[in-house]
Amino acid sequence: MTFSLFGDKFTRHSGITRLMEDLNDGLRTPGAIMLGGGNPAQIPEMNTYFQTLLAQMLESGKATDALCNYDGPQGKTELLALLAEMLRDELGWDIEPQNIALTNGSQSAFFYLFNLFAGRRADGTTKKVLFPLAPEYIGYADSGLEEDLFVSARPNIELLPEGQFKYHVDFEHLHIGEETGMICVSRPTNPTGNVITDDELMKLDALANQHGIPLVIDNAYGVPFPGIIFSDARPLWNPNIVLCMSLSKLGLPGSRCGIIIANEKIITAITNMNGIISLSPGGIGPAMMCEMIKRNDLLR
């Protein structure tokens, strides 16, 4: 038996698959110490909250509705409206439900986005994903349908007291050319925990606008939720930014709920990809998120 080129690429060893296998083994091996990637910590108070919430949703029938029905390919309609309203009210963003799509985890969201904006084009050109900082998240490395889809830039390193240091974007040497299809940065960065400053993010946004390409922000750990961030950082979104969020680091990795906030053209593309690849995103995570927003608990 032989595979296609697609099969050859996606059946070979990958760092992120090994990481997830190690994570699974670690969860089921008492006493294992996770020195690599890990399952989000199970905080007893959060587990109690989720158990209570799910029990109430079962009692009311909302959990059954979520499990026994498809949502549309854009995601749960109720959540799209509630989340857009919350972000308008809390952050002042000019955002509507048509600016949001859900995916089966943010990992699949980045697979969609990388291959939407990078790779071969109809005119014969090839675009790449630019990471303005390195190191970056290992899960990006094998997400391209084509080889050599990614290019990264060497950072400036600021030396701090007591042996600490901080990564910064080296804007003087950052190259954005015709071959650049999108800029991508995680904030905070996985695995270093580095947080790109507000000024750096604004500069990247300006450069992306100048070159007519999107700035994609991986916000899995960031603000406004789940807020696992310990420095000053302001949430940023506009129609040229693609902001990717997740319920995983909120404590619900098993819900596989990714959130993409973008302009309507991108959301329409993601919706179509969802329909073709997975019919629709899973419903239980979005149903829980609806209840958290209604109770004013999501940002608490």
Please report, for each region that a protein language model flagged, where it lies by residue.
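A structural signal for well-ordered alpha-helical scaffolds and beta->alpha junctions
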Residues: 16, 47, 75-80, 201, ...
